[in-house]
């Protein structure tokens, strides 16, 4: 079956479903790397992607945002001039109650009320003020970091804002 739209999983109610030792068949998160670029660089500013609303971000959306930001930064500023880090981890296991999806299926299957469902993926729960992604750059690459995070935010299902913080004393805030 195809993947359901993100709107089915964006909002949440109730506690997170995270106990993997009791859940058989949880798929692995699609996020390949959580830290990219030059880890040991000397940077001036830290740009953060901060969430405005509470919700859930699926692991494939986090991976799409990571790929978009990393590709833009590596092509514009070079691999040695930035450090990109994903700050959230998709712990919450998403479930889906599989239903028949073809013509006339409504006559064959009513479905059970409040059916539990099988694990289909994972999501990260975020709240207002949660930092999802951070980019560290030098002063001359600040505009590229802003554009990379703007592109990454377009891949996420919730609204976000970009905040810059100076890493060294004496630098003025942006």
From Swiss-Prot:
Family matches, as PROSITE patterns: RIBOSOMAL_L10E
GO annotations of cellular component type: ribonucleoprotein complex; ribosome
Record key words, sorted: Ribonucleoprotein, Ribosomal protein
Taxonomic superkingdom: Archaea
Family listed: Belongs to the universal ribosomal protein uL16 family.
Alphabetical list of PANTHER family matching this protein: 60S RIBOSOMAL PROTEIN L10 (PTHR11726)
NCBIfam families: PRK04199.1-1, PRK04199.1-4, uL16_euk_arch
Protein name according to UniProt: Large ribosomal subunit protein uL16
Organism in which the protein naturally occurs: Staphylothermus marinus (strain ATCC 43588 / DSM 3639 / JCM 9404 / F1)
Gene name of this polypeptide: rpl10e
């Amino acid at each position: 079956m195809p993947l359901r739209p993100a709107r089915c999983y964006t909002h949440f109610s109730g506690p997170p479903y995270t106990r993997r030792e009791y859940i058989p068949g949880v798929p692995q998160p699609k996020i390949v790397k959580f830290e990219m670029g030059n880890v040991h660089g000397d940077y001036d500013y830290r740009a953060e992607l901060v969430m405005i609303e509470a919700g859930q971000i699926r692991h494939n959306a986090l991976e799409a945002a990571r790929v978009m930001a990393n590709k833009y930064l590596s092509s514009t500023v070079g691999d040695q001039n930035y450090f990109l880090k994903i700050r959230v981890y998709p712990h919450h296991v998403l479930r889906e109650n599989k239903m028949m999806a073809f013509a006339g299926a409504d006559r064959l299957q009513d479905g059970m009320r409040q059916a539990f469902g099988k694990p289909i993926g994972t999501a990260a729960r975020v709240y207002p003020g949660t930092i999802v992604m951070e980019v560290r750059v030098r002063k001359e690459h600040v505009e590229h970091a802003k554009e990379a995070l703007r592109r990454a935010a377009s891949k996420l299902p919730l609204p976000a804002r970009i905040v810059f913080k100076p890493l060294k004393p004496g630098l003025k805030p942006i």
